[in-house]
Structure formats: C-alpha cells, structure tokens
C-alpha cells in the first residue's frame, strides 16, 4: 500500500475485526509490560529496611501501585512493612505480576485470532452487507461495563466487603497499612486526603456510569446530534477517547504531585510542598515541645522522635530536588540512608540557641546562615573571611546532638561545627552509604516526580491529539473537499455562473 508511517492506522479504518485485534494487542503489550516490570522490580528490591530504604527511595514504580491496592506479601517470604510471612497466598506481588503476564499472553493469542478471522458476521450491517459498527450502542456497552467495574471496586474492594481494602495512613506517613475503608458520604468525602472519598466516589461514579450506559443502550441519538457530532465516524470515537485519557492524566498528575489519599507518602515519598512548608519539621517540634511539657529532658524528647518522621524531614527526599536527565533512584543520588545522627542544636558563646536557615527547594547551593529565635542573623559561614563579622570562629558557635546516633555528643571545633551547619541546611542529618551503589551525591527525584512529569507530558501531547482528531472528524468534508451539494455543482451547466448557487438554471 506504501503508506507513510504517520498514516498506517488507516488500514483499520473500515475494518472492525482488525480494529478490535490491534486494541487487544495493545492491551497485551500494556499488561505484559506491567507484569514484566513488576518482576524486574521484585528482583532488585531490598525489603530489609522499610523505614530508611523504602520502595520510593529505591526507585520502585509499579510496586507502590500494587501496594496501595492491598498487595503486601511476597513469595520470597517478606512483607512490605518489614515482617516475615509463611503463607503469602496467590495474590502476592509475584502472583499479580504472573497474572498480568498470563493475561498478556491470552490477549496476544486473541489479537492474532481476530487479525486472521477479521470478517465476522457480527461486524456486518445486515441491511447493506458491508462492515459497520453501531458506535452509539458500543458506547453504551462500554459505559455500562466500566460503570459496573467502577461500582464494584468502590463497593467491594475498597470497603473490604470482598477484597483487602486499600493502603491507609496517618497524615505523617508513619502508621500505614492495608485496611477496609468506609465510604464518606458527607462533605468530608470531597477532601482529597480522606480515604473514604475513594470508596464513595467510585460507588457514585459507577452508579452514574451504569445508568448512563443503560440510557445509551435504550435511547438512540437524535439525527441532528448524530450528524452534528459525526457519531458514525470512528475518528470521533478516537477523539473523545483521547479526551478522556488526557483529562485523566492531568488529574492524576495533580493528585500525585500535590498529594492525596490515593498517593500515600509511604509508597511514593513525600511531596515538595511538605518540605517547602516545614510540614514534618513542625510536627517534630510539636512532639518535642509536648515531651518537654511532660518534664522530659531535651535528649529524652528528641530520642522519642520516630526515625521515619525525621527521615521525611530531609531535603534529599524532596521529589523536586531531582534534575532533568538525572536517571536512577534516590539511593543512586545521595546514597542509602543508614541512620539518623540526631538533631543538632547550635549555640553561641552566650548560650543563645541558633537555627540554621534551611535550603529552599530550587537552590543547589545556599549560604550557611544561623539565626536566633527572633530571626536575627547571629552567625554564618562567610564567603569572604576578611569582611566577616558573624563567622563560627568569631561568634564561638558549638553544636550538641539530641536523639539519634550522636545523642549527647557536642562539638566546639569550628571545622566540625561548620560541617554540621552545612548539613543542617538539608534538614535532619543522616548517615548515608554512598559506596554500595557508587552513588554520586547528586539528588534524584522519587517515583512521585517521574509519574507527574510523565503524565503531565503525555496529557499535553494527548490534548493536541484530541484537538487534531476532533477537528479532522468535525471538518472532514471541508478537508476532503467534499461538499453535500457537490453533485449539483459538478453537473455541467447547473448554474449560469460556475459555482454560484444563486444562479441555478431553471428547467424549461
């Protein structure tokens, strides 16, 4: 046929059997990729430290999605929360991966069958004997079936009525586990961080889809609407399908980047806004203040801070710290976290407590500035020593650690104090192993960043695809040069003036 590469899809334009075949093959490729990717990730995933080396630090992409839907066990005998198990059951990580690969193989065979046996009776219009699809009816069928799936997911899987539930955690990502979720039917269901909204919205949307599907199965579109929206043209289906996909991609890019109940930080890592707003830092200080109010010492109060919470309050876990073309997991960047050194408290020689100003998200370097409780600069690491007034040496800054591995240790040596002041710019201080993976020390993004970038990019691309194919189907006659009144115009002598319909000849 000699089609250029960008027009090859015309081979299935008027061939319903092979149109079905290529869609089944596409499903086979998607399911096959998902299953294969899951097996690859399981082969390289280290489940030994869910606190300091969780899945998102290791760059896992599909494991978090399986986990949020209720899969927590592996045939390798481990649990995602760090425990060991003896009976993981069929629906383990490997079981789900295997199911996708088996499904992919079946779809592959079905695609070949439909490619060979393309001329089926079901695709023929009995009135004309030509291949034809009743697109409004097919739309109704798909709407009904997707409504059933949506309702079933919300009413059974999420609620635990027939299924495991979903991943639910506290606002600080410390106590996450898979559990059933009750639908939230009040106004709280519209809060994107309330898990109950996932159940209620799927039930509501599924019900609407079922009713809408039945409507489109039982009511034919009016003729003017059918013609106006080009409902008989398969490119209309393509255009509206692309619209649905790009809209969904934009939505999930938003829920992933800004955070929601569907994207728990234990599975995908914290958001950049939690660093920008000092979200975890505030909670840590609140807990320490509560401990001090109970007559605990500073050392005791800081020692009770969970290592998991302290680790979230580290800039290396900020997904916006990754850079373009920085491939690899977070562990390949700043290294594998080994332990929390503790919280450094800086003081000048008068005993005044000083706080290191933290690095904003979009800075690679930032001046080391220490301020007091009123925000007044009291010490710094100067760029020019000759002009310095607040250097660590001049002000006599010391540092003492509370909690963590260096609990109770203090340093007064200026070089050591400056070292920890620089590290305190990045949040809580952790010991990082850069040797094991030959990590280069340059921050990487988390799967949260990759997912957002990928879906936002493809959503934009698909938006233009929707405009393109929508315009092609709506203005098909214009682009093709076909006019509804063309038959009258091409008749020789139909008009006194060529192409002017106002000068139509009268029959004698």
UniProtKB/Swiss-Prot annotation:
Cofactor binding note from Swiss-Prot or TrEMBL: Binds multiple chlorophylls. PSII binds additional chlorophylls, carotenoids and specific lipids.
Entry's Gene Ontology molecular function annotations: chlorophyll binding; electron transporter, transferring electrons within the cyclic electron transport pathway of photosynthesis activity
Compartment annotation: Plastid, Chloroplast thylakoid membrane
InterPro entries on file: PS_antenna-like, PS_II_antenna-like_sf, PSII_PsbB
Entry-linked SUPFAM superfamilies: Photosystem II antenna protein-like
The keyword Nucleus is assigned to this record: no
Primary residence: plastid
One Pfam family linked to the record: PSII
Membrane topology: Multi-pass membrane protein
Record's keyword terms, sorted: Chlorophyll, Chloroplast, Chromophore, Membrane, Photosynthesis, Photosystem II, Plastid, Thylakoid, Transmembrane, Transmembrane helix
One annotated Gene Ontology cellular component of this protein: photosystem II
Spans through the membrane: 21-36, 101-115, 140-156, 203-218, 237-252, 457-472
A biological process from GO: photosynthetic electron transport in photosystem II
NCBIfam families assigned: PS_II_CP47
Function: One of the components of the core complex of photosystem II (PSII). It binds chlorophyll and helps catalyze the primary light-induced photochemical processes of PSII. PSII is a light-driven water:plastoquinone oxidoreductase, using light energy to abstract electrons from H(2)O, generating O(2) and a proton gradient subsequently used for ATP formation.
Family: Belongs to the PsbB/PsbC family. PsbB subfamily.
Complex formation: PSII is composed of 1 copy each of membrane proteins PsbA, PsbB, PsbC, PsbD, PsbE, PsbF, PsbH, PsbI, PsbJ, PsbK, PsbL, PsbM, PsbT, PsbX, PsbY, PsbZ, Psb30/Ycf12, at least 3 peripheral proteins of the oxygen-evolving complex and a large number of cofactors. It forms dimeric complexes.
UniProt protein name: Photosystem II CP47 reaction center protein
């Amino acid at each position: 046929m000699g089609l250029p590469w960008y027009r090859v899809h015309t081979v299935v334009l008027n061939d319903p059997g092979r149109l079905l075949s290529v869609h089944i093959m596409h499903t086979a490729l998607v399911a096959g990729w998902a299953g294969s990717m899951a097996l690859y990730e399981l082969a390289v995933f280290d489940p030994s430290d869910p606190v300091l080396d969780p899945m998102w630090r290791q760059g896992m992409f599909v494991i978090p999605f399986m986990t949020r839907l209720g899969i927590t066990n592996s045939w390798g005998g481990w649990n995602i929360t760090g425990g060991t198990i003896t009976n993981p059951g069929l629906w383990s990580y490997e079981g789900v991966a295997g199911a996708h690969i088996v499904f992919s193989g079946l779809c592959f065979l079905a695609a070949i069958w439909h490619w060979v046996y393309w001329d089926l009776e079901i695709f023929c219009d009995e009135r004309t004997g030509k291949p034809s699809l009743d697109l409004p009816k097919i739309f109704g069928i798909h709407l009904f079936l997707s409504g059933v799936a949506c309702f079933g997911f919300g009413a059974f899987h999420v609620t635990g009525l027939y299924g495991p539930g979903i991943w639910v955690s506290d606002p600080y990502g410390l106590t996450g586990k898979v559990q059933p979720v009750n639908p939230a039917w009040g106004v709280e269901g519209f809060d994107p961080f309330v898990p109950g909204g996932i159940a209620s919205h799927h039930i509501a949307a599924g019900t609407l889809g079922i009713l809408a599907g039945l409507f489109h199965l039982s009511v034919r579109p009016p003729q003017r609407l059918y013609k106006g929206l080009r409902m008989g043209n398969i490119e209309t289906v393509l255009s509206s399908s692309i619209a649905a996909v790009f809209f969904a991609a934009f939505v999930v890019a938003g829920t992933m980047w800004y955070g929601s109940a569907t994207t728990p930080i234990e599975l995908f890592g914290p958001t950049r806004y939690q660093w920008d707003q000092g979200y975890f830092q505030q909670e840590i200080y609140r807990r320490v203040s509560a401990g001090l109010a109970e007559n605990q010492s500073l050392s005791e109060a800081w020692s009770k801070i969970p290592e998991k919470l302290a680790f979230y309050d580290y800039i290396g876990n900020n997904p916006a710290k990754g850079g373009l073309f920085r491939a690899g997991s977070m562990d390949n960047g700043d290294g594998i976290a080994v332990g929390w050194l503790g919280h450094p408290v800086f003081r000048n020689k008068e005993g005044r407590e000083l706080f290191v100003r933290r690095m904003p998200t979009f800075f690679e370097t930032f001046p080391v500035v220490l301020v007091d409780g009123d925000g007044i600069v009291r010490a710094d690491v100067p760029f020019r020593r000759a002009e310095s007034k607040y250097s660590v040496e001049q002000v006599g800054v010391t540092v003492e650690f509370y909690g963590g591995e260096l609990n109770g240790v203090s340093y007064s040596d200026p070089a050591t104090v400056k070292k920890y002041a620089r590290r305190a710019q990045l949040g809580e201080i952790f010991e990082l192993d850069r040797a094991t993976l030959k990590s280069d020390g340059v921050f990487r993004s988390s799967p949260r960043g990759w997912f957002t970038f990928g879906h936002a990019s493809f959503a934009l691309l698909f938006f233009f695809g929707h405009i393109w194919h929508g315009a092609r189907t709506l203005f098909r006659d214009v682009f093709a040069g076909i006019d509804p009144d063309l038959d009258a115009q091409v008749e020789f002598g139909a008009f006194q003036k060529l192409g002017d319909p106002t000068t139509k000849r009268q029959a004698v």
